[in-house]
Amino acid sequence: MEMTGFELELMYQVTEAWDLMVTYGYLEAEYKDYLADLTGDGIITDNSGLIPRNTPENTFGFTTSYTTQIGDGELKGRISYRFRDEMNSDSSNNPYGDLDSIENVNATIGYTIDNYSVTVWGRNLTDEREQRWATIGGLTSRGWWNEPQTLGITFAASY
């Protein structure tokens, strides 16, 4: 297998209260000499040139957070965005294992005072559905999907 790539993470504190973080990953992956029976039929084939499963070419993320004092408590907010390129989840690169690229946005805002906090949060705010995994083989194929847009409020107390 031959892999070439890099990852970049940048963090910047804009002010004492405001942080930014950016991540980027690039990956080029390919099997060079890959002799194997990928279908279970007992025949070994040359699979050189296939792309290893679950290896997206590009990934990207952005997060910003802000914290400030309000009254006797602390207000914290955070927004995150992530992108993952299309990829294939099957070792033989079966088209049924193709997973589309995805984008996702999550956010939280919370207030803490003394031992109590309340946080309003949202996951998958764009309600983008993504297949997380696909398994192909035998008589069955299956896949798992991410959670839909989910909103909530969390109340917490610590003692």
Where are these regions (language model features)?
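Gram-negative outer-membrane beta-barrel transporters
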Residues: 1-91, 154-158
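Short, glycine/acidic-rich beta->alpha junctions
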Residues: 2, 100-101
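Short, basic/aromatic-rich helical patch in the C-terminal catalytic core of site-specific tyrosine
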Residues: 8, 107-109
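Outer-membrane beta-barrel domain signature
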Residues: 47-53, 93-98, 140-144
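Transmembrane beta-barrel architecture of outer membranes
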Residues: 57-61, 102-106, 140, 148-150
